[in-house]
Amino acid sequence: MKPYIICHMMSSVDGRIDCAMTAEIEKTDVYYQALDRLHFDAVLEGRVSRQIHYALPAPFKANDMVPIGEEKYHIAHPADHYEIAIDTHGTLKWPKDASNNNLLVITDEQCPQEYHGYLTANDISWIACGKKGIDLCRSMEILGEKFGVKRLGIVGGGHINGAFLQAGLLDEVSLMIGGGIDGRAGMAAVFDGIRQTDYPPRY
């Protein structure tokens, strides 16, 4: 069974979520206070957000591109809270202390098995799920059933929020609107990246 999933975000009045912009809005600490009150036992971010805030600058480059080729998972150690990264192709490298934060990385099954070996060697949990592209629905089932996650927070960026929305996985949205306006063209929105032009609105 999948966790109860809440997308928790802070945006400008016009719905933009550029980190440098939202950091300039007063009282951003209120966002993190609300995050604590939501009592998540795992928080998930997309590759770009994790690259900006947590991963090492240089990407992981596999010498052997043989894919893992099947659905698998690895629990480095059971935890009460996980920091989750979506990294479809296995490109993020992590600092040595990443395991201290109970990091969990989700890839698809085309990701090189060498990357999963790298994660295992560094005491990092992982899930490989989806023949071509991550199967979000199935990976959430694994997260709930095998890792014991009951309440999951999706905290950006806009494309991963949009992917969870499109997959019908969101149970709730928590949106804090800061007292600022972005207005710049091309900046990510709270929910972004859905290319299906006839995509119906979600209620």
What role is predicted for each listed range?
Residues 1-203:
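Enzymes that bind and transform nitrogen-containing heteroaromatic metabolites
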